[in-house]
């Protein structure tokens, strides 16, 4: 059976939940839809990690954030960035994991009160850990109300 074709009026009547971005975040990104998938890409040493950490802190005001730190782990550079952006202020809403097992992440996200935002740093390291396109797509489709943010180097 063919899938439904939507008229412009049908699309306009679909209820979507927007993320309540405020201030500079709203100025730059507007109010994106909950459950979107983001891809943040920039050259190495361009401030990407600092931007993502500030973004994660803002997201903690909306819901919990799980930072999948595959490239950097939890070493000195991560410790410094956490201190620089005072991530201890959002201690209860921000968690870091370093396990690249996509099935383990799926189990974690299936639990009640799991993170609303998942930041995967980086896409390349996730791919090396076995995150093939079909598995990643299935993960995103299973958790449609969660926002996935992939960080990538150009």
Which residue stretches match the model-derived regions?
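Short amphipathic alpha-helical surface micro-motifs
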Residues: 2, 20-22, 76-80
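Pre-Walker A adenine-sensing motif
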Residues: 16-32
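Charged, amphipathic alpha-helical linker segments immediately N-terminal to NTP-binding catalytic cores
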Residues: 1-15
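A short linear-motif detector with a strong N-terminal bias
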Residues: 16-19, 45-46, 74-75, 128-129
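P-loop NTPase motor core
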Residues: 33-42, 50-54, 99-154
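Conserved P-loop
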Residues: 34-104
